[in-house]
């Protein structure tokens, strides 16, 4: 059983998945920092010096200045500023993944076009498209050259 697990764990797909998860986690941290430390402060500055992470609605009757004070008092709050940060975070990650997948698909399509086998050739006599394996043109009935042998036009 240990041998089977070792074979499974060392397969290319599992290793690729592991690398993807690690890189995805690191990328998520970078995007979260970008959102929390750069984007939302800039948006907040444009909207009147508002820090999104501090925006909340207090559902208890007691006033609190910060979310931390409300949490310490175990008060019920709706932390919509933190939710907005999470939404912005999600949009950036989703857009980044969209761009990466779009590029991968573009490269894959280009590679498929380059690798597509040639299935037709041009008849040298009537210039029509014919199958590569044809020995006689179905349009002008000319005999065609085959590997190493030149056949005359009838």
UniProtKB/Swiss-Prot annotation:
Gene3D superfamilies: Large-conductance mechanosensitive channel, MscL, domain 1 (1.10.1200.120). InterPro entries: Mechanosensitive_channel_CS, MS_channel, MSC/AndL, MscL_channel. Pfam families: MscL. It is found in: Cell membrane. The chain crosses the membrane at residues 14-34, 38-58, 81-101. Keywords: Cell membrane, Ion channel, Ion transport, Membrane, Transmembrane, Transmembrane helix, Transport. The keyword Ion transport applies. The keyword Ligase does not apply. NCBIfam families: mscL (TIGR00220), PRK00567.1-4 (NF001843), PRK13952.1 (NF010557). Homopentamer. Channel that opens in response to stretch forces in the membrane lipid bilayer. May participate in the regulation of osmotic pressure changes within the cell. This is Large-conductance mechanosensitive channel. It comes from Brevibacillus brevis (strain 47 / JCM 6285 / NBRC 100599). The lineage of its organism: Bacteria, Bacillati, Bacillota, Bacilli, Bacillales.
């Amino acid at each position: 059983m240990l041998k089977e697990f070792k074979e499974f764990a060392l397969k290319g797909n599992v290793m690729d998945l592991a690398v993807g998860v690690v890189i995805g986690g690191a990328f998520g941290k970078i995007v979260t920092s970008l959102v929390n430390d750069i984007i939302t402060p800039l948006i907040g500055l444009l909207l009147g010096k508002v820090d999104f992470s501090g925006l909340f609605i207090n559902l208890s009757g007691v006033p609190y200045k910060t979310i931390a004070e409300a949490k310490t008092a175990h008060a019920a709050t709706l932390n919509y500023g933190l939710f907005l940060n999470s939404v912005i975070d999600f949009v950036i990650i989703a857009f980044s993944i969209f761009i990466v997948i779009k590029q991968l698909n573009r490269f894959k399509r280009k590679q498929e076009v380059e690798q597509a086998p040639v299935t037709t050739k041009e008849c040298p006599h009537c210039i029509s498209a014919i199958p590569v394996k044809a020995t006689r043109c179905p349009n002008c009935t000319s005999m065609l050259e085959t590997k190493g042998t030149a056949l005359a036009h009838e």
